[in-house]
């Protein structure tokens, strides 16, 4: 779009334009101003992308000032060591729990305005210094009048309107990019990514969804206790009578987040395997899972149990996607490559003709050549997964759908954990 704006000088614009004729002069001041604002938004997006991809540290304060969408996208990039340096990923991962905080006087005001009636009657002590801060809210320690230690999460501000506005603007930019490069829609679809981010972030902005999500995951755990027990998993106790859309009261969990365990190198490989076993049961066995299980959203408590927190973003994976991926990984772990490639064909609406099947399997064989001989540090699983998805879509007609993105994203999270903690591990142990 031409970005013309009036500076009191004839024909000053961002772009190539000859002197305006009489028709050009019919643009209203509003239209010129809107064009200018769109150019500013585009330049802001380009600056954001440069902050993410440039060598050296990103300006985290600047990113946070761009709003909730910028923070959420940065958190996704933080789990892409195949795209960014390990050092850059580690820096961006600070945004999981070390976001900007609310001044203490504003926290008090929010609680007085937003907390349920009778809230203060149950609080014996409240720490004005935040225990942790994330993109949506921040957490403070407190003690109830009955002596129980809790944490109180407070939504930082009314993010919803600006967040949805930013998403719509980004959608317009992505549609333009897709019109120029249609393959973007088929593989690593940025529109699917944005819709996924919009969906789970919108749910995060209503803290009641954390109680609902935690209860749903705990119910699934109970239903699987006979066939697939998960004794190392638990969920925090919530206090629904003291919570609402803006304020959440839950148990104070003594322990360390996975992020803290990574930083002090205290996360053994066998513990990661147990976490993957648990998360995999939800993703592949049930298809309902924690959709934002980054290293800041899982605590290892004093009893060595995994405690899933921030349970507001519960995702559903299409059964044909989750089951096909499970069979793919199972056969791959047995070095049955042809059977693994065959399993992925289940994601296609109908089986492609034999020429396409042969082409698909040939390309997959190239991707997975020497797979079992390489370590995670030598070959990113995320990179392999992206190439696999691309080949499945282009050569086999697979359709992961927008609903399939959360499970791919969860696999990216797990890959990032392994790369940061045990890069020497073989892809097939």
Map each language-model feature to its residues.
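Broad phosphate/nucleotide-binding scaffolds in NTP-utilizing and phosphate-metabolizing enzymes
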Residues: 1-280, 287, 295, 299-323, ...
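Histidine-centered phosphotransfer motif of kinases
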Residues: 290
């Amino acid at each position: 779009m031409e970005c013309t704006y009036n500076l009191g000088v004839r024909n000053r614009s961002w772009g190539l334009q000859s002197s305006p004729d009489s028709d050009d002069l019919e643009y209203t001041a509003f239209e010129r101003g809107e064009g200018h604002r769109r150019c500013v938004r585009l330049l802001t997006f380009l600056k954001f992308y440069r902050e993410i991809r440039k060598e050296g540290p990103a300006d985290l304060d600047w990113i946070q000032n761009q709003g909730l969408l910028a923070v959420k996208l940065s958190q996704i990039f933080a789990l892409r060591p195949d795209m960014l340096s390990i050092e850059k990923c580690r820096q961006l991962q600070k945004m999981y729990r070390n976001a900007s905080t609310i001044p203490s006087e504003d926290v008090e005001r929010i609680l007085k305005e937003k907390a349920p009636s009778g809230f203060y009657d149950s609080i014996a002590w409240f720490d004005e210094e935040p225990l942790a801060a994330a993109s949506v809210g921040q957490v403070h320690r407190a003690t109830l009048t009955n002596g129980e230690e809790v944490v109180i999460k407070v939504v930082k501000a009314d993010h919803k309107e600006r967040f949805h506005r930013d998403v719509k603007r980004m959608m317009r930019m992505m549609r333009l990019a897709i019109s120029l490069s249609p393959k973007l829609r088929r593989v690593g679809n940025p529109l699917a990514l944005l819709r996924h981010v919009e969906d789970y972030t919108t749910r995060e902005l209503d803290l009641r969804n954390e109680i609902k999500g935690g209860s749903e995951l705990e119910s699934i755990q109970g239903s699987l206790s006979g066939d697939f027990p998960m004794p190392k998993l638990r969920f925090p106790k919530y206090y629904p009578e003291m919570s609402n859309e803006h304020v959440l009261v839950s148990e104070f969990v003594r322990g360390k987040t996975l992020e803290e365990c990574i930083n002090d190198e205290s996360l053994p490989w066998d513990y990661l395997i147990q976490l993957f076993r648990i998360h995999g049961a939800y993703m592949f066995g049930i298809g309902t899972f924690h959709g934002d299980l980054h290293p800041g959203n899982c605590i290892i408590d004093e009893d060595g149990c995994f405690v899933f927190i921030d349970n507001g973003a519960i995702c559903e994976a299409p059964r044909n996607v989750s089951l096909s991926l499970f069979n793919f990984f199972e056969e791959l772990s047995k070095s049955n490559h042809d059977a693994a490639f065959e399993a992925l064909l289940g994601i296609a609406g109908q089986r492609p003709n034999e020429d396409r099947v042969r082409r698909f399997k040939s390309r997959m064989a190239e991707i997975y050549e020497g797979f079992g001989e390489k370590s995670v540090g030598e070959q990113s699983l995320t990179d392999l997964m992206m190439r696999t998805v691309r080949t499945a879509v282009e050569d086999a007609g697979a359709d992961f759908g927008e609903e399939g993105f959360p499970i791919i994203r969860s696999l990216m999270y797990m890959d990032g954990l392994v790369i940061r903690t045990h890069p020497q591990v073989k892809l097939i142990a």
